[in-house]
Amino acid sequence: MAQHTIDQTQVIHTKPSALSYKEKTLVMGILNVTPDSFSDGGKYDSLDKALLHAKEMIDDGAHIIDIGGESTRPGAECVSEDEEMSRVIPVIERITKELGVPISVDTYKASVADEAVKAGASIINDIWGAKHDPKMASVAAEHNVPIVLMHNRPERNYNDLLPDMLSDLMESVKIAVEAGVDEKNIILDPGIGFAKTYHDNLAVMNKLEIFSGLGYPVLLATSRKRFIGRVLDLPPEERAEGTGATVCLGIQKGCDIVRVHDVKQIARMAKMMDAMLNKGGVHHG
């Protein structure tokens, strides 16, 4: 597959300021304002608690806060657009006003993404890669904001896992570009834990370099996921070390953004990996 040379500056065009992933791995801290997320459901569902947790994550090294109002865990309850908006919009407005940090909205609904960006979010993080809601790519294009296109599919009906994943992701890219999304605003996510078996997830982790080889920035979202729990035989809240191992491998294989719950530990690991890999061409310290 031909490599794209998208944006030599290696910048994600966020607000209030753009973020460079050339010299450091960007850490995206997860803020779930849901009652039923697999890892932290119900913990941050009040405005004050959500704001406090966002501030803690920024202090711990997060560059982006990813806010989600509907759990994406398998079997989670679907919520209406109105309910999702009522959860995320006040949090986005408050964090934008008080913390001034780039915010990502974790949604696959175009109407929610639209309102979230108007409220201050500057990245759309879509677990369906602009394939679930036909208006999603247009919303990203209209607002000229980055969009994370995650790999996903309704069934695990692969002929050949990795080539099929690349093909699926490039379909998402095509949808986005045809809707008017600037290629510099496209971020890819291999979708660890979505429509993949335990062995699929390990195989994808082992070949992450093929995704960074497409020429777009890559977001890796492995935090506390089930395949880590299966390897370590540990519950979600005890998977920070396992998550750290996946993040270190991901950074070595060219991932640019890591989406995590355990920001303090992972931000330190990312900084150490960046130094050892001489990311940005300047030795740290």
Swiss-Prot record:
InterPro entries: DHP_synth-like, DHP_synth_dom, Dihydropteroate_synth-like_sf, Pterin-binding_dom. GO terms for cellular component: cytosol. Pathway: Cofactor biosynthesis; tetrahydrofolate biosynthesis; 7,8-dihydrofolate from 2-amino-4-hydroxy-6-hydroxymethyl-7,8-dihydropteridine diphosphate and 4-aminobenzoate: step 1/2. Its EC number is 2.5.1.15. This is Dihydropteroate synthase. Coiled coil: none annotated. One of its GO terms (biological process) is folic acid biosynthetic process. Mg(2+) binds at residue 32. Keywords: Folate biosynthesis, Magnesium, Metal-binding, Transferase. Pfam families: Pterin_bind. It comes from the Bacteria. The lineage of its organism: Bacteria, Bacillati, Bacillota, Bacilli, Bacillales.
